[in-house]
Swiss-Prot record:
It holds the Pfam family PsbM. One of the components of the core complex of photosystem II (PSII). PSII is a light-driven water:plastoquinone oxidoreductase that uses light energy to abstract electrons from H(2)O, generating O(2) and a proton gradient subsequently used for ATP formation. It consists of a core antenna complex that captures photons, and an electron transfer chain that converts photonic excitation into a charge separation. This subunit is found at the monomer-monomer interface. One of its GO terms (cellular component) is photosystem II. The keyword Thylakoid applies. GO terms for biological process: photosynthesis, light reaction. Belongs to the PsbM family. This is Photosystem II reaction center protein M. It comes from the Eukaryota. It is a single-pass membrane protein. Keywords: Chloroplast, Membrane, Photosynthesis, Photosystem II, Plastid, Reaction center, Thylakoid, Transmembrane, Transmembrane helix. PSII is composed of 1 copy each of membrane proteins PsbA, PsbB, PsbC, PsbD, PsbE, PsbF, PsbH, PsbI, PsbJ, PsbK, PsbL, PsbM, PsbT, PsbX, PsbY, PsbZ, Psb30/Ycf12, at least 3 peripheral proteins of the oxygen-evolving complex and a large number of cofactors. It forms dimeric complexes. The chain crosses the membrane at residues 5-25. It comes from Panax quinquefolius. It is found in: Plastid, Chloroplast thylakoid membrane.
Amino acid sequence: MEVNILAFIATALFILVPTAFLLIIYVKTESQNKK
């Protein structure tokens, strides 16, 4: 079974992008709460 590189990249982006977005929001919220 051949691995589709584009499909793998698309899946990785689909998972990583929202995760990074939520992580950034979490860090910003934490930094605001600590002040």
